[in-house]
Amino acid sequence: MSVLPRYLLPDNSEVDETGRLSIAGCDLIDLAMEHNTPLFVYDEDHMRARCQEAVAAFPDGVAYATKAFLCKAMAQLAYEEGMDLDVATGGELHVALEADVPADRLIFHGNNKSMRELVAAIDAGVGTIVIDSRTEIAKLQSILAASDRTVRVMIRVNPGIEAHTHEFLQTGATDSKFGISIDGGLAKKAVDQVRSIPALDLVGVHAHVGSQVFEASSFARAVEVLADFIAQIDVPALSIGGGLGVPYVEGEAAPTITEWGRAISTALAGTGLRVKMHAEPGRAIVARAAVTLYTAGTIKEIPGVRTYVSVDGGMSDNPRPVLYGSGYEVFLARATSADRTLEVRLVGKHCESGDVIVRDGSVPGDLQLGDILATPVTGAYGHTMGSNYNMVLRPPVVFAKGGDARLVVRRETYEDLLARDLG
C-alpha cells in the first residue's frame, strides 16, 4: 500500500522530519493530547480560500450549504468571505442568526418546512425562500394572507437528471422527494400559482442534481434542461444548487470549484439565456479542510481473516460509511509519510457490527495501542450528522490557523446527555 496521498489533506498541512503532521502550524498529536479524542481539526484558511474561490466562480451569487457543516464560527466565516448561507431547517436558521449573519443573506430550503419554520423565516426577514412543493405555496399564502409583506421566492424544480452518484444522494431525478417535476407541466403550474399571489415575488428557479457528483457534465446537462424551462417562464435567476464531489480516497478526482463554475457558465452561455447564475456548494468548501483524530484502543488480529482496529469514535461522528458505503483513508498522525503495509479494518466503539469507519484501510506496520489515528476529508457531514448513539459524547471542533487552535465547539459532557431528560 502506498503512502497517504497528500492531496487528501488540508491545504496548510506540513509533515516534519519525524513524520508528524501539523495543520496550519498545529501539531495533531499535541491537539489530541490537549483536547482528547475523537476530535475534528479544521484548517481555517483552507475554508476561507474555498469560499473565496466560490465567490469568484459564481459572481452573481453563491451560498454556503450549511448542512455540510455548521456552527456559529463556520457561519461567520462563510459570511465574512462573501457567501450567503443556505439553511434547510429552523435549527440551521437559528444558528445562522445567532452567528449574526444578516437574515437577508439567508436562503431557506427544505422539502417539508413547517408553518412555524416559515413564520420564523418570514419574521426574521430571510432573503429568499425556496419553494419545494405546491403544498408549500398554500402554506405561504395562508401565512401572508393578512399581511402586507412580500416574500422573495424561488421554485425548486426537478430537471429529470440522474447524476452518477449513490442512490440516496440523487436529488434531481423525476422520482425524488425534493422539488417539483418539470415533466408533465407540474413546475409550470407551480409558477402560475405563485404568480397569482401578490405577496410572493418569484425571483428564480432552483435545481439540485445530486450530491458527491464528480462529472461536470451532469451539471451542464441540468443547465440545458433548465434553460428550456426558464425560457418559457421568464425569471431573472437560476440556482444550480450544490453537489460538487470531492475525492475521499486514493485514485478519486473531482473538478475544482473554479472548473465547476466554468463548466456551468459555458453551458449557460451555450443556451443563449441571459439570467443570473447562482450556486450552493457545501462539501466542496469544507470536506478536505478537516481530519478526525481517534485513539487506537483495541487491536484484534484474526489469523487468515483480518486485523480490526477499534477506536474511540465511530458511526456517531461519521455515519457516512454506514449510510452510503463511503470510503475513507486512515493514517498515523506520527507517521504520515510512512508506507502503510498493515491492512486493517478501522471500526468504532458502538454496539453495531456495521460500525465501520474504514472498511479496507492500511496503516504502518508498527501500529501500537494508544496511537493517534487520523481520517482525512471528514469536514463535511460528520459533525452535522453526528449522534449520541450509545450515549457517547459528541466530539469538539477546533479551527487551526497560524499556529493557534481555536476551540469552536466543545466536547459534550454527561450532563449534556441529561439536559432534556425530565425523568
Name every feature range the model reports, one short phrase each.
Residues 74-75, 96-97, 118, 140-141, ...:
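Short glycine-/acidic-enriched loop or helix-start segments at secondary-structure transitions
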Residues 1-152, 188, 195-201, 403-423:
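A charged N-terminal "starter" segment
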Residues 2-3, 143, 160-300, 363, ...:
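Active-site loop/helix belt of alpha/beta enzymes
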Residues 11, 19, 38, 60-62, ...:
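A generic secondary-structure signal marking the coil-to-beta-strand transition
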